[in-house]
């Protein structure tokens, strides 16, 4: 059984997407998703707040929530998905929960998350 576990671990490490920075729940992120339309493939931007991160290894995924025309839209992305081009962190949110389900009931400015002051490492 130990050999099977090691094999699964090695495969999940190879499947890990290297273009994803580490982020937490409450962070505002830009998710660049590869979309195939007919023969063409383009990259589409999906910007929102990370509401949850779940799973581990190759099954790890995260959910991003955004407001589109006044309607809340949530989309779940697997970390190991080949459709993910890259993930950029826009703001680091200051939250005390790992699952932000309470944002679903909030509207307007109440649904905003306070951001931490982050020093840029430009040098």
UniProtKB/Swiss-Prot annotation:
Family annotation (PROSITE patterns): RIBOSOMAL_L19
Ribosomal protein keyword on record: yes
A Pfam family annotated for this UniProt entry: Ribosomal_L19
The keyword Ribosomal protein appears for this protein: yes
Molecular functions per Gene Ontology: structural constituent of ribosome
GO biological process annotation, one example: translation
Cellular component annotations (GO), alphabetically ordered: cytosolic large ribosomal subunit
Keyword line: Ribonucleoprotein, Ribosomal protein
Classification via HAMAP family: Ribosomal_bL19 (MF_00402)
Function: This protein is located at the 30S-50S ribosomal subunit interface and may play a role in the structure and function of the aminoacyl-tRNA binding site.
PANTHER family in the record: LARGE RIBOSOMAL SUBUNIT PROTEIN BL19M (PTHR15680:SF9), RIBOSOMAL PROTEIN L19 (PTHR15680)
Homology family: Belongs to the bacterial ribosomal protein bL19 family.
Name under which the protein is recorded: Large ribosomal subunit protein bL19
Protein's organism: Bdellovibrio bacteriovorus (strain ATCC 15356 / DSM 50701 / NCIMB 9529 / HD100)
């Amino acid at each position: 059984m130990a050999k099977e576990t090691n094999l699964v671990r090695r495969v999940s490490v190879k499947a890990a997407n290297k273009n994803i920075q580490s982020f937490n729940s409450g962070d505002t992120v830009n998710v660049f998703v590869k979309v195939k339309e007919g023969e063409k493939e383009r990259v589409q931007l999906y910007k929102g707040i990370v509401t949850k991160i779940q799973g581990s290894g190759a099954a790890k995924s995260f959910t991003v929530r955004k407001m589109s025309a006044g309607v809340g839209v949530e989309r779940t992305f697997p970390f190991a998905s080949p459709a993910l081009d890259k993930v950029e962190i826009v703001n680091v949110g200051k939250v005390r929960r790992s699952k932000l389900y309470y944002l679903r009931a909030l509207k307007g400015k109440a649904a905003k998350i306070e951001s931490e002051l982050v020093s840029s490492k430009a040098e």
